[in-house]
Regions:
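Helix-coil-helix junctions within alpha-helical repeat/solenoid scaffolds
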Residues: 1-10, 16
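C-terminal substrate/ligand-recognition segments
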Residues: 21-40, 127-136, 162, 181-188, ...
Length: 292
């Protein structure tokens, strides 16, 4: 909303609330403003005219990616400095020219060991959880990866505190992928990958949605031929370690390797001990069993 300086109590709605578009940031410039957010779990950047409030949404070339504004310190500009990356595209900084949409690449993250993006593919899958909820999955593999269930897969998820897991570039994954693995990110409930409701649907009394989503994604990837039961590696730390503890007990036959780093697996006793310095601040996430 906006208001005139002389009438600060009178607000005009500029950008209405939306269940589809999850606003994460905005930036103001002289002739326009820019909104950043996610729709269906994918980053969206929109340039909006002050006078008409019409929006131009920028297009990005890959099915799964991370995109947004970079450093733009000037107020009166004709170009926007932006950044883009994906699971197969190293971090790229470019200028977007407002007049005609031309994109000038300024810098691409250097990979000292060498990297040929043409050898790899990234996809965005939708796998249906047991309650009918569609779960987005970002996946990376070599282009010659066979969908016959013969290959191992590394599956990552977090699903807590409203933290989205972005499908960005990571050099450490390439070693696994070059040795025949697929690498997948399950955008499970408990993060805010698809907005605040996505986060709320994976906390408190709905916490089991997070665990079920992760297991169902693993089973869905098996059904699609990306891997087989017993060939999935996974890991998680802290709240992600809690996820590891849950899934290795509920479906032990799915996993070939599970690493739980500093896992938060004694939730009940921790939430019952209010003398622990972190416990009261964690009650909104896990619940307060002392009172309820």
């Amino acid at each position: 909303a906006r208001a005139r300086i002389e009438m600060p109590d009178q607000w005009d709605e500029v950008l209405p609330a939306s269940d589809a578009f999850y606003l994460t940031d905005f930036s103001l410039f002289k002739r326009f403003y820019v909104t950043e957010g996610r729709e269906n779990g994918l980053d969206q950047v929109e340039i909006r005219d002050y006078a008409t409030n019409t929006a131009k949404r920028l297009d990005f070339p890959e099915a799964s990616y991370v995109a947004g504004l970079d450093d733009n310190p000037e107020y009166d500009v004709d170009t926007l400095r932006m950044s883009y990356e994906s699971m197969v595209t190293p971090e790229t900084v470019f200028d977007y020219r407002l007049a005609d949409g031309h994109r000038e690449i300024l810098k691409v993250q250097e990979i000292p060991s060498g990297f040929d993006p043409a050898l790899y593919a990234t996809q965005r899958l939708i796998i249906t959880a047991r309650d009918g909820t569609p779960i987005p999955v970002s996946i990376l593999h070599r282009r010659d990866f066979p969908l016959d269930g013969s290959r191992p897969l590394y599956l990552y998820g977090y699903g807590a505190y409203g933290i989205a897991i972005e499908p960005g570039f990571g050099t450490t994954r390439l070693s696994l992928v070059d040795r025949g693995f697929a690498f997948a990110i399950a955008h499970i409930r408990g993060g805010d990958d698809l907005g605040q409701q996505w986060y709320k649907d994976g906390k408190l009394e709905k916490r089991t949605n997070t665990f079920n989503d992760f297991v169902d994604v693993a089973k869905g990837l098996i059904a699609l031929g990306y891997t087989s039961a017993g060939k999935i590696a996974t890991s998680g730390g802290s709240a992600g370690g809690e996820l590891m503890g849950a899934i290795v007990n509920s479906d032990p036959d799915l996993w070939g390797a599970v690493a739980a780093h500093v896992p938060f697996v004694d939730v009940l006793n921790t939430m019952l001990d209010e003398t622990l310095p972190l416990t009261p601040g964690e009650w909104p996430e896990w619940g307060n069993p002392i009172e309820d």
